[in-house]
Design a protein with these regions (language model features):
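Proline-centered turn/helix-capping motifs that create local helix->coil transitions or kinks
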Residues: 36-44, 107-117, 121, 151-168, ...
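C-terminal catalytic core of tyrosine-transesterase DNA break-rejoin enzymes
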Residues: 37, 86, 90-97, 190, ...
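Catalytic-site neighborhood detector that most strongly recognizes the C-terminal catalytic loop/helix
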Residues: 53, 57, 119-121, 235-261
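Short, polar N-cap/turn motifs at the start of nucleic acid-interacting alpha helices
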Residues: 105-112, 205, 226-248
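C-terminal secondary-structure termini that scaffold catalytic or DNA-interacting sites
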Residues: 110, 123-138, 145-147, 153, ...
């Protein structure tokens, strides 16, 4: 299977990257893990495959000006897209983790969200919701009073839409970001596509993507003085060394004065 994937071409006619092959393998492994959990198969053969390590590209972390322009652009977006992207920036959660969020995962008193599952798109409209791969992936993230107001406002809108259009009550196990008229979560690729449209429409760097919001959250934590272990725990990394390897440049860059300006813009504009 992997050899066939490596022979494929992307939309630009170029060979697919090794990281893409790994993403495909992860999706297949998730399905097989579920089959093993349900005693359909005894072992997950996908976990026995050793893949070569890939060179990690330095991520484009938005500048202060880019963050401000992005916030302005998000203010014009439909509510569910706006909440999704702001939540990604505020918590550092992955696309799949946000897509798999249910209302029962929110603790309003503690202002916390239990990250305990992830949504993976398989093919077409099929989507698979799975548990975190590691213990560190099952975690709690916290949000501000401003984010609480935004989430409560969003929940009221979801209550109204579910009552009027679905003719039922909003359940605690409903997904926060749900396909209208169904109980299925929206797919991560939907938010990827929309984000690209936002970037293009507002003249923002095309190097940015939804995962850049996770990097932004991490950079702001680092700029705010959080240590590596704390950031690793919030992001769901198994080892603090993973966090350090990814954000070593961010640690250096965000020690500079612009980081303070970025935190200020976060405090007033980004919930």
């Amino acid at each position: 299977m992997l050899s066939q994937l490596r022979k494929r071409k992307n939309r630009r006619g170029q060979p697919v990257r090794e990281s893409t092959v790994q993403h495909y393998l992860s999706a297949v492994s998730a399905v097989l893990s579920d089959a093993k959990r349900n005693e359909i198969i005894q072992t997950n053969p996908a976990r026995m495959i050793d893949l070569p390590t890939t060179n990690r590209m330095e991520q484009h972390i938005p500048t202060v000006q880019e963050v401000q322009r992005l916030l302005q652009a998000l203010s014009m977006e439909p509510r569910h897209f706006r909440v999704f992207y702001l939540l990604a920036m505020a918590t550092g959660c992955r696309r799949g983790e946000l897509c798999a969020l249910q209302w029962q995962d929110i603790d309003w008193e503690q202002r916390s969200i239990h990250i305990c599952r992830s949504a993976v798109k398989i093919t077409g409209d099929e989507i698979f919701v799975k548990e975190p791969k590691t213990r560190s992936g099952d975690r709690y993230v916290y949000f501000s009073a401003q984010m609480e107001n935004l989430l409560r406002e969003y929940r009221r809108a979801c209550l109204y839409i579910t009552t009027i259009y679905d003719e039922r009550e909003l359940d605690t196990n409903d997904f926060l970001f749900r396909r209208q008229g169904t109980r299925l979560p929206m797919t991560p690729t939907t938010f990827t596509w929309r984000f690209k449209c936002i970037l293009k429409k507002n003249g923002l760097p095309q190097e940015l993507n939804v995962h850049s919001l996770r990097h932004t959250a991490a950079s702001l934590m680092i700029a705010g003085g959080a240590d590596v272990a704390t950031v690793a725990g919030i992001l769901g990394h198994s080892q603090p060394s993973t966090t350090l390897n990814i954000y070593i440049h961010a640690f250096d860059k965000n020690k500079k004065p612009p980081a303070r300006a970025c935190r200020k813009c976060w405090r007033y504009d980004i919930v």
